[in-house]
Amino acid sequence: ATLIAKFHICFEEGGVKKGDKIALCAKNSAKWGISFLAINTYEAIVVPILADFTPESVNSLVDHSESVILFTNADMWKKLDIKAMPRVHTVISVDDFSLLYTSHENVRTAMKNLQAAFEKKYPLGFTRENVNYPTDNDKELAIINYTSGTTSAPKGVMLRYECLSANVEFGQEHIPSHPGDKIVSMLPMAHMRQMQVAHYAKCSFVRHAD
């Protein structure tokens, strides 16, 4: 939650508004999940892109989705062409959350002085009371998920928050899991099924310690 709050500061400095698109193209990791939730809880629209797509496809989908920020791995970033993604003003590494690129000096300054900005925003400290995410946005667009393009060019599927919550509720009811259970999945987290089963559904079980 602390990292998510810090990313929200960066989004604010970058002029990101509710409903703006932010692309996420990276290998499976805990930081993928943190990046996703940072975007999602800011009420920006997440654009997950499969990390095994060609650099040309990633360039094309980031541009097609009208994304303004890109989260990706450093090795993928080396293969991308920022000129092919003209709306993107900031690129953040999912490897270590460092800044890979920005055309906004205020974003660069915010990233450099992020801890100070965080402490200024939360002068009494960051507590569970500060973790307050939207719950009244079921009908609003949450994700643009591009298909793998097995039989044709990838298509962007537009999903509302209620689509995600309905799948989570179904999974909890019909495929229950418990603390200590192990889940084996070979799908990338940008794949809708992996995102629902191993990411969203598991996050819904998080509880604060008493």
PLM features: residue spans?
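Conserved pre-ATP/AMP-binding loop-to-beta segment of ANL
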Residues: 109-146, 153, 176-182
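Conserved adenylate-forming
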Residues: 82-109, 203-204, 208-210
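Short hydrophobic alpha-helices that are characteristic scaffold elements of the AMP-binding
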Residues: 36-42, 64, 191, 202-204
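Conserved AMP-binding/adenylation subdomain of ANL enzymes
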Residues: 165-210
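Residue-level detector of anion-binding/catalytic polar loops
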Residues: 45, 68, 208-209
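Conserved AMP-binding/adenylate-forming
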Residues: 6-53
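Conserved S/T- and glycine-rich ATP-binding loop of Class I adenylate-forming
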Residues: 22, 39, 70, 141, ...
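Conserved ATP-dependent adenylate/AMP-binding module captured primarily in the ANL superfamily
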Residues: 51-82, 167-184
